[in-house]
Swiss-Prot record:
Tissues expressing the protein: Expressed by the venom duct.
Residues carrying Cysteine amide: C17
Designated name of the protein: Alpha-conotoxin In1878
Residue(s) carrying 4-hydroxyproline: P8
Keywords: Acetylcholine receptor inhibiting toxin, Amidation, Disulfide bond, Hydroxylation, Ion channel impairing toxin, Neurotoxin, Postsynaptic neurotoxin, Secreted, Toxin
Domain notes: The cysteine framework is I (CC-C-C). Alpha4/7 pattern.
Annotated stretches, region: Ser-Xaa-Pro motif, crucial for potent interaction with nAChR: 5-7
UniProt-annotated location(s): Secreted
One CC-aspect GO term: extracellular region
InterPro entries: Conotoxin_a-typ, Conotoxin_a-typ_CS
Disulfide bonds: C3-C9, C4-C17
Amino acid sequence: EGCCSNPPCRHTHPEVC
């Protein structure tokens, strides 16, 4: 859920995960 489960967002904001 959130940025971590959205591949494009996760790639853009890896620090979130």
